[in-house]
């Protein structure tokens, strides 16, 4: 890396790294460092009247107070933080005091990883700490951390800009309390979900991510190209059709937890790639699946929060069963006053106009109903509510309702105004399924880019016979948002998709050299803030001369300074 791209603090740290090596101390040792305790466990297990406990810990220096021959640091490990008391004569028992006077006091910085061996004690101020007897350098940090400081309960120098936090999640995890806890809870959610499904006897499977046909959901896919086969492939939008093939093949129940991809918008509830759990169980229907879902979510909530309740956006949400069950057309009537039962596509289109909705000719009956529900109903269901019995036009993979003509045995679980789960009594009639796919094809021809393709191989599988089956998909990201009280999906994804980072435009060196500027001075001029040749047009040559000569001196570049007359000549040529 060019030294001009470094900050003053980064240069100092690199010099410290080199000085450590000159002393014979490797700043990035290869050997294993053996630890026997974590910070939180040390504090939890400490007893004042017990024999001093000898521990070996490792972590990152997060703060320090140097006081001559004795100092305090705060060490952060994977579980928390603990204070360490370091004295010169304890870590340097012999004549050589360099480990304290030079290494600890001058060459170590905040963010560095060290190992500490010592014994646990309580300070006069009452804080459980480690009295260091040996210090080992484990990894040098050559980029300063944005250390958050607190005074009278107020945070200073906070690393709280959302874009920076999401782009540099590694820094966010280090310096911001609570961030890591959110992701540990996410891990608990997935672990508990797996436990429930495994205990029920269902088999976890893996199915392809690259699909020849995008199927299993109504969504716009990402398209890629396989060079060897010279064919387009699609990143999967759902695992549904492959999992159903496995039910055809004889599995009692199968589930998959994995990534799906949808080439759609990004907002606080949507990310182009997201994690979903899909489950399919033979000989079950959507009524059974509602009950199973209640038990699953209740257990997850208890595992994560210790109770069946969670709080988000200031609202307390209870996952204790049972949940309300409400047909979608009844929900629309309840929220808008319009009864859509038996209405034609044109009649529903007229309702949309009366509701002053933006619609277009590509929208079929199902899409129109979906738009009405999304705009006027969805956001009103805060407590868990099963919205059931969707029109067939909205549900091309769902079995027709056993007693309600024109409707299907489908439910979506709404929580905090958003869909959390989608489930069916699965359509297993191959003739009916083919007709539904053809209807989707007509929608595609009308311009609906979310309509499903016809999957001939899936139809072939159904023709061999699929038993009555119920299936469900649950969004892990949204579930984590609910269980951890996060309002933005980016807070529960380690590395959410981001728009391209803004980069300062710079002219190529050749453009500067056309003015007679030596190549070695181009980077210096750009460091001074003149990234484009045009930036120099109206500058005072004497100021430019002072700026670049100052940088040459500050960074010890040892370049031969140009004269003011040289600089005047550069500027005149612009």
Per-region residue spans from a language model:
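Compact, charge-rich alpha-helical regulatory domains located at protein termini
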Residues: 501-574
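Class II aminoacyl-tRNA synthetase catalytic cores and aaRS-like
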Residues: 1-504
């Amino acid at each position: 890396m060019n030294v001009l791209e470094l900050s003053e603090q980064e240069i100092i740290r690199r010099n410290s790294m080199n000085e450590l090596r000159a002393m014979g101390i490797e700043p990035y040792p290869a050997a294993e460092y053996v630890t026997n305790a974590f910070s939180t466990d040390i504090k939890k297990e400490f007893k004042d009247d017990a024999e001093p406990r000898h521990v070996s810990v490792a972590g990152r220096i997060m703060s320090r107070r140097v006081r001559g021959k004795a100092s305090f640091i705060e060490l952060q490990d994977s579980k928390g933080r603990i204070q360490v008391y370091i004295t010169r004569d304890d870590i340097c028992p012999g004549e050589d005091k360099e480990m304290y006077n030079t290494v600890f006091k001058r060459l170590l910085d905040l963010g560095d990883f060290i190992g500490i061996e010592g014994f646990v004690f309580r300070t006069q101020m009452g804080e459980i700490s480690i009295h260091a007897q040996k210090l080992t350098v484990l990894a040098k940090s050559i980029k300063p951390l944005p250390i958050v400081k607190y005074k009278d309960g107020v945070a200073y120098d906070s690393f709280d800009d959302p874009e920076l936090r999401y782009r540099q999640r590694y820094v966010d995890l280090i310096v911001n309390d609570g961030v890591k806890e959110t992701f540990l809870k996410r891990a608990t959610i997935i672990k508990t979900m797996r436990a429930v499904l495994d205990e029920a006897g269902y088999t976890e499977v893996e199915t392809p991510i690259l699909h020849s046909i995008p199927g299993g959901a109504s969504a716009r896919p990402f398209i890629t190209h396989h060079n060897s086969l010279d064919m387009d492939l699609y990143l999967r939008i759902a695992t549904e059709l492959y999992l159903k093939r496995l039910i055809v093949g004889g599995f009692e129940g199968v589930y998959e937890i994995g990534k799906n991809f949808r080439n759609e918008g990004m907002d606080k509830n949507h990310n182009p790639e997201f994690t979903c759990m899909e489950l399919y169980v033979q000989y079950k229907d959507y009524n059974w699946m509602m009950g199973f879902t209640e038990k699953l979510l209740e257990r997850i909530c208890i595992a994560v929060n210790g109770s069946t309740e969670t709080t988000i956006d200031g609202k307390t949400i209870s996952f204790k069963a049972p949940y309300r069950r409400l047909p979608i057309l009844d929900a629309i009537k309840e929220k808008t006053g319009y009864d859509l039962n038996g209405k034609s596509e044109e009649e529903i289109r007229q309702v949309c106009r009366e509701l002053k909705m933006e619609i277009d000719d590509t929208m079929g009956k199902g899409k129109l109903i979906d738009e009405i529900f999304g705009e006027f109903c969805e956001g009103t269901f805060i407590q868990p509510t099963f919205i059931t019995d969707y029109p067939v036009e909205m549900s091309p993979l769902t079995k027709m309702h056993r007693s309600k003509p024109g409707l299907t045995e489908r439910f979506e679980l709404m929580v905090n105004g958003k869909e959390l789960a989608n489930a069916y009594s699965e359509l297993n009639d191959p003739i009916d399924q083919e007709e539904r796919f053809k209807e989707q094809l007509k929608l595609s021809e009308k311009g609906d880019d979310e309509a499903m393709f016809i999957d001939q191989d899936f139809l072939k599988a159904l023709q061999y016979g699929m038993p009555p089956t119920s299936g469900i998909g649950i969004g892990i990201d949204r579930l984590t948002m609910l269980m951890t009280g996060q309002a933005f999906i980016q807070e529960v994804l380690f590395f959410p998709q981001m728009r391209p980072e803004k980069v300062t435009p710079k002219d190529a060196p050749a453009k500067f050299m056309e003015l007679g500027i030596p190549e070695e001075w181009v980077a210096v001029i750009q460091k001074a803030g003149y990234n484009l040749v045009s930036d120099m047009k109206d500058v005072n040559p004497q100021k430019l001369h002072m700026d670049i000569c100052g940088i040459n001196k500050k960074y010890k570049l040892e370049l031969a300074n140009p004269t003011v007359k040289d600089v005047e000549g550069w500027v005149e040529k612009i």
